[in-house]
Amino acid sequence: MELIQDTSRPPAKYVKGIPLIKYFAEALGPLESFEAWPDDLLISTYPKSGTTWVSEILDLIYQEGDLEKCQRAPVFLRVPFLEFSAPGVPTGVELLKDTPAPRLLKTHLPLALLPKTLLDQKVKVIYIARNAKDVAVSYYHFYRMAKVHPDPGTWDSFLEKFMAGEVCYGSWYQHVQEWWELSHTHPVLYLFYEDIKEDPKREIQKILEFIGRSLPEETVDHIVQRTSFKEMKKNPMTNYSTIPTAVMDHSISAFMRKGITGDWKSTFTVAQNELFEAHYAKKMAGCKLRFRWEL
C-alpha cells in the first residue's frame, strides 16, 4: 500500500453543506455509478460508533464463526468502505467490484449523500448509534491520529466544532435522527453501541433475526468472545495496525483506544458538560431516541 505524501491534514471539503474528508468528497462522483445488489448488507454509523466492531461481528456471522476465514484480510478490505478514497489505494467502490455476493459494506454518509441505489434496492441496513459525548471524545482522538482529517486543534475547539456540525460527516444530531426516521420506512435494524456493550449476545441474536440467519448457540458465544474489545485490539486484522503511519499514527492514539461507555467523564470539564447538555436538549427536543451516557 503506497501512499503519496499529500495525505496529511487536508482541509475538509463541503458537499451539499456537509464537511467531508477531502479524498472522500472526491470519491462521491464515481460513487454515483455504484450499483447496489439486493442481497448487500450496509453497516451505517456516524464515525466512532462501533463500525469496525459490528463489521467484524457480521463477517464472523457470514463465515459461520470460522476465525481462519476472518483472518483472510484486514476488516477494511473484507467490509469495503463505500466512500473511501486515498491517494495510491483502491477506492471502496473498486474493492466492491471484486467482492463476491453476499457483500458487506459500510458507510458514514448522511442520507443526503447516500447513493440512491441502496434505497431503491431496499438494501438491508444495520445502523449503530452511540451517545454523543463518547463519540465526540473518540472522534477527537481519531482526528489526532488519522492524518486524512483536518487538524483537530484543542479538545475545547474540537468540541465546539462537533456541536456545530463542523466536523467531517457533519452533525451527529442530524445523522442519528434521520437514520432513525428511515428505519420506519426502510429495512433498518437500529442498534445502540451501549446495548452491544451491555449484552453482545442479545444484540447478535437481533442481527441474526434481522438478516434471516441462524447459528448454533456455541458459535454465537464464540463470536461474542472473538469480538470483545480485548481480542479485537490485539488482532492485526481489526486494529488497523496494517495502515501506514503516514495515514494513521498509532503512537499518537491507538485506533482501538478504550472501547468503553462513559469515557467522556475523563475528558469533559464541568463547564463543557453543562454547555453540551443545554445544547443537546435543544437539538434533541421532540426526538424519541434515548441514549445512555454510562453503563
UniProtKB/Swiss-Prot annotation:
Binding positions (3'-phosphoadenylyl sulfate): 48-53, 130, 138, 193, 227-232, 255-259
InterPro entries: P-loop_NTPase, Sulfotransferase_dom
Disulfide bonds: none
Xref: SUPFAM superfamilies: P-loop containing nucleoside triphosphate hydrolases (SSF52540)
Reaction(s) this enzyme catalyzes, per UniProt: a phenol + 3'-phosphoadenylyl sulfate = an aryl sulfate + adenosine 3',5'-bisphosphate + H(+); 17beta-estradiol + 3'-phosphoadenylyl sulfate = 17beta-estradiol 3-sulfate + adenosine 3',5'-bisphosphate + H(+); 4-ethylphenol + 3'-phosphoadenylyl sulfate = 4-ethylphenyl sulfate + adenosine 3',5'-bisphosphate + H(+); 4-nitrophenol + 3'-phosphoadenylyl sulfate = 4-nitrophenyl sulfate + adenosine 3',5'-bisphosphate
Keywords: Catecholamine metabolism, Cytoplasm, Lipid metabolism, Phosphoprotein, Steroid metabolism, Transferase
Similarity section: Belongs to the sulfotransferase 1 family.
Function: Sulfotransferase that utilizes 3'-phospho-5'-adenylyl sulfate (PAPS) as sulfonate donor to catalyze the sulfate conjugation of a wide variety of acceptor molecules bearing a hydroxyl or an amine group. Sulfonation increases the water solubility of most compounds, and therefore their renal excretion, but it can also result in bioactivation to form active metabolites. Displays broad substrate specificity for small phenolic compounds. Plays an important role in the sulfonation of endogenous molecules such as steroid hormones.
Protein's recorded name: Sulfotransferase 1A1
Species classification: Eukaryota, Metazoa, Chordata, Craniata, Vertebrata
Gene: SULT1A1
